[in-house]
């Protein structure tokens, strides 16, 4: 991003809350809706004499995420203690990973404004979450339910230059972890949190400027807005001759600005050292091969397959692969209908509109893929028209019934008998003799659509429109 002769340098740390049933080092539930301090134990609140035991699912989910991000998986990684004091960190240290993380040297590619962008993944490391401080005027309450929740912190390289690239990078990470089913990606509940590191430098300069970290960002729109604000703030500082302080700032969505929170610590301030209570994590080749085989087809590859094998436009393929459940729904529909583009069209227009209007996700759709696929096949066979299909679709949405059942109950079978349609056409032409004369003489133009509409109305929308057009063309010569 070029602004007033400056270039932004952006990196993002994304804390992915892994969807395990229990915490990283203890057996309490990770359920979000639990009451305050309900999901705690002597381990998660740091009582003396307690020992952590690593949850193996955390290792599995971390390796799968690393593989999906193209990372190298360390055969031996080490937990370290990150030492700092804060009321919601009862042990006085956080168990994390430092110089030997489980995943390193990956990258992801995505599109921004139609152009491909590749961002490096420096590392992804396992760690425990801290508790949560709730500030109430003169006092603070602490909820330790979150203490010990398993996180995988995914750290990008400083490769992004615009707020739009940063937001799309974060969206892509969320899309991948949701495809893997290792995180629900709920930003509002904090199961995916973005910390953005921003600096500015003169265009063409090679040296990085002073980095500022922005926290408290809980939507992708705010990722863009917070970075946009911070870029302009830093440029203003430089042009005034002020020194940019290495600090952590909070994004305030109500005021659309960032505020200073605290001076930003360097790694040496945390006095990292290997945790003596935890063994190194040993990853074998057989584990990696097993998890590779269990990986789903990832969104970019799936979208490309939809374009190559199903001849779908890029827009369709991109929309349909936004969520794994949506892509699955499309494939199941197309398998039943044998019509890729029609399946895409019905899902992207009719179904997604109804889902959005009802605030439902694809899993909650009352219309199942097999039902939608059958309805599309009925159109292609000429059993029903597109107009009848829309009526059946609405009935399917309301009742969840199969399209054949609705068609029979409502008498919605398409009339495809040429003799029956010819009879309807003759009746319409006889009832509109003057209009027929006007059409044939050329006195009035563009009347053909009137006759089509009249025949369709007479048939209550059940006449085969192709046959109606064909017979009318013959009779109106």
Swiss-Prot record:
What SMART domains does the record point to? GatB_Yqey
Q: What is this protein called?
A: Aspartyl/glutamyl-tRNA(Asn/Gln) amidotransferase subunit B
Protein species of origin: Bdellovibrio bacteriovorus (strain ATCC 15356 / DSM 50701 / NCIMB 9529 / HD100)
Which InterPro entries does UniProt cross-reference here?
Asn/Gln-tRNA_amidoTrfase_suB/E, Asn/Gln-tRNA_Trfase_suB/E_cat, Asn/Gln_amidotransferase, Asn/Gln_tRNA_amidoTrase-B-like, GatB, GatB_C_1, GatB_Yqey_C_2, Gln-tRNA_amidoTrfase_suB_CS
Q: From its record, what is one biological process in GO terms?
A: translation
HAMAP family linked to this entry: GatB
What this chain does, per the entry, is described as: Allows the formation of correctly charged Asn-tRNA(Asn) or Gln-tRNA(Gln) through the transamidation of misacylated Asp-tRNA(Asn) or Glu-tRNA(Gln) in organisms which lack either or both of asparaginyl-tRNA or glutaminyl-tRNA synthetases. The reaction takes place in the presence of glutamine and ATP through an activated phospho-Asp-tRNA(Asn) or phospho-Glu-tRNA(Gln).
- Statement: the UniProt record of this protein carries the keyword Ligase: yes
The UniProt gene name for this protein comes to gatB
Top-level taxonomic group: Bacteria
The EC number(s) attached to this protein equal 6.3.5.-
